[in-house]
């Protein structure tokens, strides 16, 4: 496996060098810069596997850097870990709304940072593994059947090996794209892909926020906030649901959590 490339965008040189030394000891390749604009340029040039991003910086802050990366087709899928002195819950929520994958507050434990980096990279690497979907063609909805036929024409191997299908929604595990009946093809961020993949791979199951934090994103027990899950669910619904206020794909079961359900095909 090739060495992962980590880009550190941090204006505090001492903090930046400390992170660099620690991650270099774990055999990561490191690039550093002290401002957001240069960070975006470096990311475009080198396509890092992960960005560690400070919030408070000169010129443009970390939130704006994150938003620009998420709106850039070349950079939109790169995982981003916010590292900042901002500790209020609303600051964390703002970071996730901007598109962050994880959030660590200063002062931080350098070993915890390394573990979070490794967890994010593990989640990203899972995307390379195709999952076998055993649902037969006769059970596909008309929309899903059309998508599956189009994908099969592009591939030499059975398309069922690299897709998950629930109702009208088709997840392509090779391209990390979700085909939806109202928004067409949607390219998911790594954290959105992991969430959708887990739910679609377990249709009908209920997942509490704590269970999703543990099973999808490798958060240790009793860590992570349910608010983070709600933000990720909201962002995802905004992208894939016909009416995010009345979701039909990812449903909320009050008091229990979230689920996707396989509806019967009547045609």
Over which residues does each language-model region extend?
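Active-site beta3 strand of CheY-like receiver
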Residues: 46-52
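Conserved Asp/Asn-Gly motif in the active-site loop of CheY-like receiver
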Residues: 33-37, 92
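Receiver (REC) domain active-site loop signature in two-component systems and cognate sites
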Residues: 57
